[in-house]
Every structure is written in structure tokens, then in C-alpha cells.
């Protein structure tokens, strides 16, 4: 009888240990997830701050639109910080379709804005390319450690996500 109660106590102890380790593991996974979300939140917050500072309503060719102040944004170090964050962002953190869509849309627009800012003054982003080598096929920077063109981002990544409104969210630096 003593042996049965000791065995029962051992199983209860083992159960408590396994349960405790599981809870610790879940806690650690939660912290990893929070850190991943924090990196994405910081990137998005930085991007939003730039947009708030350099995008304002304006008029061009009789049309009212939100206009980027490229003459000023090109001098802001936060644009370089954004490019670094895009380059170093871990691909494995993009674990949902929603995160991928938002991240890659922002990446496309950040790369477009940077391309214009780096070549300012410029009338159209398209003018950086030629008939045989359009700007969309030029290297635009790195995203998640991979060299990226605007065409790869749009056609090979964003369109594959199956979101029909994607084209309306791409600004092409216009």
C-alpha cells in the first residue's frame, strides 16, 4: 500500500512539473509573440510618424490628393531607419495573411517613397527606368533580408496574397 501511494504521489508530482513547464513555455511563447508584434508596431509607428509629418492635402493638375513632401522627407533620418527595419525584419514574424498584407504594402510604399526621395527632384518614379528596364525591375532595397524590386513585391508577393484591394493601396510614389 505504501508503494501505491508513493507511485500516485510521483505521478501527481510529474503532472504538476509537466503542467508547470507547459505554462512556462506558453508564457515564453507569449513574450516572443509580443516582441515580434513590438518590432512590427515600432516599424508601423515610425512609418505613420513620417506620413504625418510629410504628407498633406494638396492639388496637382486640378486634382485634390494627399501629397508627399519629397524635398523635405529626403533629409529625414527616419526614412533610413525605416529601410533598415524593413531589411532586418524577420520573415517568420509575418505569421498571418493580415500581417503579411499590411507589412508588404507598407514595404512597397516605403521603398517607392525612398526611391523618389533618393532621386529628388523627380517628376515621376517611372522616369528612373527605361522601356527595356522599367524602374519596377530595379533593385529597390532589402525586405526581410532579401533583395527586392517593386515588381517582385507587387506581383510575386502582394498579388499572391489574394487581396483584391491591393492595387488601390499601392501608391507607386505618385
Report residues per predicted region.
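N-terminal secretory signal peptides that target proteins for export/translocation
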Residues: 1-11
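Bacterial N-terminal signal peptides
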Residues: 15-27
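Interaction/scaffold regions that mediate signaling and macromolecular assembly across diverse proteins
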Residues: 36-94, 98-174
Amino acid at each position: 500500500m505504501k508503494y501505491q501511494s508513493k507511485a500516485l504521489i510521483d505521478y501527481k508530482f510529474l503532472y504538476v512539473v509537466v503542467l508547470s513547464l507547459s505554462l512556462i513555455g506558453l508564457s515564453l511563447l507569449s513574450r516572443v509573440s509580443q516582441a515580434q508584434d513590438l518590432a512590427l508596431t515600432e516599424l508601423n509607428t515610425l512609418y505613420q510618424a513620417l506620413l504625418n509629418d510629410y504628407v498633406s492635402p494638396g492639388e496637382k493638375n486640378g486634382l485634390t490628393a494627399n501629397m508627399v513632401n519629397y524635398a523635405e522627407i529626403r533629409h529625414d533620418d527616419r526614412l533610413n531607419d525605416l529601410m533598415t527595419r524593413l531589411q532586418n525584419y524577420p520573415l517568420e514574424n509575418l505569421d498571418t495573411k493580415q500581417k503579411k498584407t499590411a507589412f508588404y504594402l507598407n514595404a512597397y510604399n516605403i521603398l517607392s517613397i525612398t526611391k523618389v526621395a533618393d532621386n529628388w527632384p523627380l517628376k515621376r518614379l517611372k522616369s528612373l527606368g527605361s522601356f527595356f528596364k522599367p524602374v519596377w525591375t530595379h533593385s529597390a532595397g532589402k525586405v526581410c533580408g532579401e533583395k527586392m524590386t517593386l515588381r517582385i513585391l507587387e506581383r510575386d508577393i502582394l498579388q499572391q496574397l489574394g487581396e483584391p484591394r491591393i492595387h488601390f493601396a499601392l501608391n507607386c510614389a505618385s
